[in-house]
Amino acid sequence: MKKTTTLLGICAILSAPAFAAQLTLQKELVPRVINGEFVYPEWISDNNSIELKDGENQLAVTVGQIVFEDGKRRKFDSQPLLLEFDAEKDAELSLTYKTFRTIEEAKAFELDPKVVLKDKNGKEVDFSMVQLRKGGLQGFRDYEREVADYNNAVNKQATKSSIAQSPAVTKTLKESFNELSREEQQEFMQWAMRNLK
C-alpha cells in the first residue's frame, strides 16, 4: 500500500504541467484578444490574470472605467490597445495604467494612451503598442477581426516594402547578364525560356 501511494505521488509530480507565464492586469483593463484568439471570461482568473505562451505574445486590451462627467458617473470604454511583448517561461508580468477620474482625463488618455508592463521584480518590460481606432458603437465590436485586419495590413506593408527593394535586385541581375559572354547569354536565355511560367 505504501509503495502504491508513493508511486501515485511520484506520477502526480512528474505529470504536473509546467508553469506558464502569467499576466495580471489592473482591474479596469479588459483583455479582448490574446495571440489572435478571443479571450473568453473563463480564461481570466479571479485576480484578473491570464496565461501567456512562452515567447512572443500579442494582447488587445481595453480600459473600462467609471469617470465623472458634469457631476455624473459614466462608464468610459477606450479604443483597444494592441501590445506585443515577449514572456519568458514562468514569468509573472503586470500591466497597469494611471487611473483617471474625469472624462477629460479619459479623453487625454485616449489621445495618448500610456500603460506600463512590469515583471515580478518591478522592472519594466519592453513592448510595442498601437491603438486600433474605429468609429461606431463600441459595444458591438469584433476585436478578434480588428486584430486580424491589423495583422494583415502590417503583413501587406512588409510585402510592399520587400517588393520596393526588388529593383535593386533587378539591376544587379541585369548587370550580371551584361557581364556574360555571348554564348553564356544565349544559354541563359534558353534556360529562362524553358522555365518561363
Curated annotation (Swiss-Prot):
Pfam families, from UniProt?
Answer: DUF2057 (PF09829)
Which terms are listed as keywords in the entry? Signal
Q: Which domain of life is it from?
A: Bacteria
This protein's record includes keyword Plastid: no
Q: Which residues form the signal peptide?
A: 1-20
- The set of disulfide-linked cysteines is none
Family recorded in the similarity comment: Belongs to the UPF0319 family.
Record's protein name: UPF0319 protein VP0761
